[in-house]
Regions:
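C-terminal soluble interaction/assembly domains
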Residues: 259-263, 277-278
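A short amphipathic alpha-helical interaction element
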Residues: 220-257, 271-275
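N-terminal nucleophile
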Residues: 1-226
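A general structural motif at alpha-helix termini
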Residues: 75, 153, 236, 245-248, ...
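Short, solvent-exposed loop/turn and secondary-structure capping segments
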Residues: 33, 256-259
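Short, hydrophobic-biased amphipathic alpha-helical segments
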Residues: 198, 264-268
């Protein structure tokens, strides 16, 4: 009833790596049950007749140094319901493992490779996981992991996805210090709990996440000159705010404008100027 991808970002350095899961299903709020990830540890998707305890157990095994395959073996050995489970795991190094129990409903299966595990059950066919793998491998390895995961999820959805229909989707990505304000490791945590086109809606939300919850790169920062400050102060007042700081706070642009107003993100500048497609 679900298809998912678990992956680690490209590159050998775990200090800058991301781990994540993207999932879709004809199931209410699939993001509350399937994905889990911890930066510098790994990620897991547990599905089919999901044993949600797998999430904490697998991450604990990985944190103790187990590889993905060893962690998976330990989960299955301790679970009498293993034949009804489907699970994918990627460890800190990008080693991947997947299991599809013999009692999972057709079509059910998986594929693994360097840095990813893709699995699904009650699918329209094997072409779903094949399309997901092809899309993930064709995506830019330097792109944000969330974008690569959603490219795979979207490909699986287009290929047929869950044979029962569509209802929910989610994406979870972790990277050390990547959270809001750098205060935690949650790079992306988005869920579409009940929607007629959940994967499409998840793509829309990821665009908003990039704008509001992702820090500006050095290339995106535009120095705040006196002339630019005057222009933006006028925009703020025209929008009914007392000043530029008030506008930034009201519009939730804190991640895209310097606290001391020494720079502004070029996307925010485009929005302020009303440029087409800026949002």
């Amino acid at each position: 009833m679900t298809f998912s991808i678990v992956a680690r970002s490209a590159g050998p350095d775990p200090e800058t790596a991301s781990w994540g899961v993207a999932v879709a299903s004809k199931f209410l709020a699939v993001g509350s049950a399937v994905p889990a990830a911890v930066a510098q540890v790994g990620a897991i998707a547990t599905q089919a007749h999901a044993n949600v305890a797998y999430k904490g157990l697998a991450l604990a095994h990985l944190d103790e140094g187990a590889t993905a395959s060893v962690a998976l073996q330990r989960l299955l050995e301790e679970d009498e319901g293993r034949d009804h489970r489907q699970v994918g795991i990627v460890d800190v190094e990008g080693n991947a493992a997947s299991h599809t129990g013999s009692a999972c409903l057709d079509w059910a299966g998986s594929v693994t490779g360097d840095g990813y595990a893709i699995q699904g059950n009650i699918l329209t066919g094997e072409e779903v996981v094949s399309a997901m793998e092809a899309a993930f491998l064709a995506s830019d390895p330097e792109a944000p992991l969330a974008r690569r995961l959603l490219a795979a999820l979207e490909a699986g959805d287009r290929a047929g996805g869950d044979s029962r229909g569509r209802q929910s989707a989610a994406v979870l990505v972790v990277r050390e210090g990547a959270g809001y304000g750098g205060m935690d490791d949650i790079e992306v945590d988005l869920r579409v709990d009940d929607h007629t086109a959940p994967v499409e809606e998840l793509q829309r939300l990821l665009g908003l996440n990039d704008l509001y919850l992702t820090a500006s790169t050095e290339e995106e920062k535009v120095p705040m000159t006196p002339e630019l400050r005057e222009e933006l102060e006028a925009v703020a007042r025209a929008a009914g705010h007392r000043d530029l700081e008030g506008w930034v706070g009201a519009e939730n642009y804190e991640m895209r404008v310097a606290e001391d107003l020494s720079w502004v993100d070029r996307r925010i500048l485009a929005i302020a100027r009303g440029e087409e497609g800026a949002q």
